[in-house]
Design a protein with these regions (language model features):
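Boundary regions of SH3-family modules and the immediately adjacent low-complexity/disordered segments
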Residues: 1, 24, 28-31, 39, ...
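Glycine-rich catalytic cores of cysteine/serine-nucleophile enzymes that process amide/ester linkages
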Residues: 26-27, 82-96, 100, 136-148, ...
């Protein structure tokens, strides 16, 4: 079974339980594969980053077939407004956040009339995207301007600008090239932070003059 997020956002939990921590979010248009169903919960694997977690079955919206799913995967287009909306077939409005994938909106009979990107963008545009998240509150597992965590910020900024990186900082560090010195870095590069044991625990995006935008 396959699904698509047809809501503004859906919490993805560590376990199939209302009290379980939120480890990530589905945003509007995100695609996923169903791995298991348990009572009122569905274990999913998010298509973009293979992240696994549980969502409430009430929020599950099924895609008819694997063929439809594979077609939708090819049709990525990310909204560029801090917040916008899609209109349903019966003229209701659903708010959507920056970085929502509106590429599948027609499939679920929704219309969208806003700015979007479906290509790789340059560093200047990447930095402009990052600055849209300034003053967003910190939220563990969050991926929206209304609540976001450090690796959610880096993943969303890169995603909107056409780059695919993992969900968690400890995995993001393995992508790209290591730089020996800060002087070698450019705006838009990722800066990682470790603890006393050498484990990556935080990530931010480099700006000019070695400033960093991050969520904490």
């Amino acid at each position: 079974m396959f699904g698509i997020c047809n809501l503004s956002s859906i919490p993805v939990r560590k376990n199939g339980d209302d009290k379980s921590e939120m480890i990530s979010q589905l945003l509007y248009g995100d695609l996923y594969e169903v791995i298991e169903k348990k009572e009122k919960w569905v274990l999913i694997k998010i298509n973009f980053d293979d992240y696994k977690g549980w969502i409430d079955y009430k929020q599950f919206s099924e895609i008819e077939s694997e063929n439809h799913f594979n077609e939708l995967i090819k049709n990525k287009a990310y909204s560029l407004d801090l917040i916008n909306f899609v209109e349903t077939y019966n003229k209701e409005l659903i708010p959507i956040f920056l970085g929502s994938n509106i590429g599948g909106s027609e499939y679920i009979k929704h219309t969208f009339d806003g700015e979007f990107s479906n290509k790789i963008r340059n560093r200047r545009q990447l930095i402009e995207t990052a600055k849209l998240y300034l003053n967003a509150p910190y939220l563990w597992g969050g991926k929206t301007p209304f609540g976001i965590d450090c690796s959610g910020l880096s993943q969303m900024v890169y995603k909107i600008n056409g780059y695919k990186i993992p969900r968690d900082a400890k995995d993001q560090v393995n992508f790209g090239a290591d730089l020996g010195f800060i002087e070698e870095s450019k705006e838009g590069d990722l800066a990682f932070f470790d603890n006393d044991e050498g484990e990556i625990i935080h990530v931010g995006i480099l700006l000019k003059n070695n400033f960093i935008i991050h969520a904490s």
